[in-house]
Amino acid sequence: MKKNETKLLASRAVNKIGNVMYDYGNSTWIAGLGSIGQKYMGYYQLAENGISLFLNPIGGAVADRFKRRQILLVTDFIGGLMCAVLAFIGNDNIMLYGLIAVNAALAIMSAFSGTSFRSYVVTVVAEDRLVAFNSRLEVISQIVSISSPLFAFLFVDRFGLKPTLILDSVTFFLSFLLLFSIREEEKHITTEKRNTSIKSILRDIKEGMIFIVKEKEIFFLLVIASMVNFFIAAFNYLAPFSNQLFVHPSSYATLLTMGAAG
């Protein structure tokens, strides 16, 4: 396996571990606030899901017209910086609002970085190695999804929220360094795409929407996925309170692991 492919896989694995740690630590902390936590958990998740709903369609259009590596580097650096700042907040009230604000900001960046990563893979990985790379990426993602909640439980239970935020910051910066060390020219930036404007991005989004509507099978799958996500949203809201519901500190981590395992 080429070095750049290894760096790309390592970057994705580290980033995913950080995301699980961040969400687990924040959710358990907010859920532990009692009745106040029930209300603010809704705000916390609404900020993420609402932003994702509106910005995900834009992410692909932006990734097509800008350098994907730069998007990934900027989002990782800002994510690491914000988590580091959060870790030094001493007031619980400020921390609560800070977690919601940073989660919203990370949702904005995720809308662009997720699409950019998938598109950047084509730049780094040769065409004849894409299938093998994607299979390795999927295996690593599944392993991380299953193991990270248990690791997050052990770490958060032992050290608390602030050290978890510091660890999240480290994962973002480590992902940044791995991506920064990759040197591959991005050839998708044509002369036309250099002259990017809001109008051109909106035109790309419109063309994508028309394509989805015309392709009935894709449209049907998206409708089904939306319906499934509606029920998953209810589960995601209740899951962080499972530690209190089942009176066991590892209940939430167990649910996340079982969900990842399918």
What role is predicted for each listed range?
Residues M1-E5, E185-L222:
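Juxtamembrane intracellular "pre-TM" segments in multi-pass secondary transporters
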Residues K7-Y24, Y44-A61, K67-M82, G98-D157, ...:
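Substrate-agnostic recognition of the 12-TM MFS/MFS-like secondary transporter fold
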Residues S27-S35, A87-G90, S147-L167, Q244-F246:
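Transmembrane alpha-helix termini and helix-breaking/packing motifs in multi-pass membrane transporters
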Residues I36-A47, F246-A261:
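Loop-to-transmembrane helix entry
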Residues F77-N93:
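C-terminal ends and interior cores of transmembrane alpha-helices
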Residues V85-G90, L106, L178-L179:
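MFS-fold secondary transporters
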Residues S119, T123, L161, L165-T196:
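Helix-loop junctions on the cytosolic side of multi-pass membrane transporters
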